[in-house]
Amino acid sequence: MWKHKLFPLSPLTTTWHQAVEVIDPGLHNRNAGPDFFNAKIKLNGTLWVGNVEIHDKASDWYVHGHDKDERYDNVILHVCGTIDVEAKNSKGEPLVQLQLDIPENVSKHYQELLSIDQYPPCYQIIPSLTRLTVHSWMSALQTERLSQKTDAIEARVKQCNGDWENAYFVTLARNYGFGINGDAFEQWAYHLPLRAVDHHRDDLFQIEAIFLGQAGLLELNTIPERYQKNALNDGYFSRLRNEYLYLSHKFSLQPMDYKQWRFLRLRPQNFPHIRISQLANLYYNRRAGLSQLLEASTVKEAKQVLSTSVTEYWETHYTFGSTSIRNEKHLSPFSLNLLIINTVVSILFAYGRHRGEEKYCDRAFDFLEELKAENNHIVRMWKECGLPVENAGDSQALIQLKKEYCDRKECLRCRIGYEYLKR
């Protein structure tokens, strides 16, 4: 209510009977300290500039220990749903307090948003939104999503001891899980000693042996029981196992727990074996390193960097011990687009922000604008409501909106929710 100035129609007055005029509610602070910074309000016509703290009850000021925290000494207004006590700062000075009652129409509309059993619950307001409102909110959500992905990448860089090349590979691997196996692929990538693998980068067979071995997929008990007998007579499987045994001893390798991999309701082309073989091919060809990615100035060039297929054995297999119709199993256009969105764009933005080079950040946004919007249930639901979805930037914004606002019932922080509430 305070952030969006959803105030009652009646004049606002403090507990000391001062007339309150809100010029600027301030900047919302999501970290430690007062809730809003640099607010501008007039008390009896005099302009005050400072911080504002929001509480359900005035006594929460003491519950949260603000009376002993000097960071709250410059609070110029304490806004509460109920004023049940006088609040004082660490200097013992009483605070100016304002009881803010929720307008009846706002409360009614908010309860509607919480109770409507349809997604999105604000669907009725969508057709009346201005293009400016939609565009500005989508742009903000797009940047917010990229910033979150950047935080995740920076955490990987830290875990990789500052090695951006390694962190990029972990990010790429995670996105090869295409959601279902994302966590497992990330753990697998951390289990790969890439510096050691580099010594064998000219031998695709050895790379695949290390990649599959570290995934725990060269153990017989990882193969469905009906295929185990065939696998034991499979020369390629035996060669891979023996090669991994040698390399694991050489580099003191320990495989991850294969139970982290999920196969249930997974399309065969998404089986870890297939995706790992594609990654092995990509790694062997030396085309998909960080430097090549940074040099890709167009979506077409980025797709060329990431285009790959499986090794010959996997053209006729989805798992060990079971043959299938020959299929080269290239990455599909759909999969390539997802990798561009979730890996290339994210790495460009994160690396650009890290290095202070705007050209990479700008390129990330250009790629999102050039790529087609994703076609998932979230995007389809918003489109059915009349919201225009023109490119991948828009679809990424809608994913952010659902995950960070709709699913958490954060309608009060959403600009579309604001439009619904103020009706």
Predicted regions and their residues:
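Short Lys/Arg-enriched alpha/beta "domain-start" segment
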Residues: 1-21
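Active-site beta-strand-loop-beta-strand hairpin of nuclease catalytic cores
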Residues: 40-51
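Active-site ExK catalytic segment of metal-dependent nucleases
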Residues: 49-57, 78-80
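N-terminal nucleotide-handling cores and adjacent loading/scaffold lobes of large enzymes
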Residues: 67-71
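Compact, glycine/acidic-enriched structural inserts
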Residues: 73-75, 79-137
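Hydrophobic, aromatic-lined core segments that form the binding pocket/scaffold
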Residues: 141-397, 410
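Cysteine-cluster motifs in flexible loop/terminal segments that predominantly coordinate metals
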Residues: 396-423
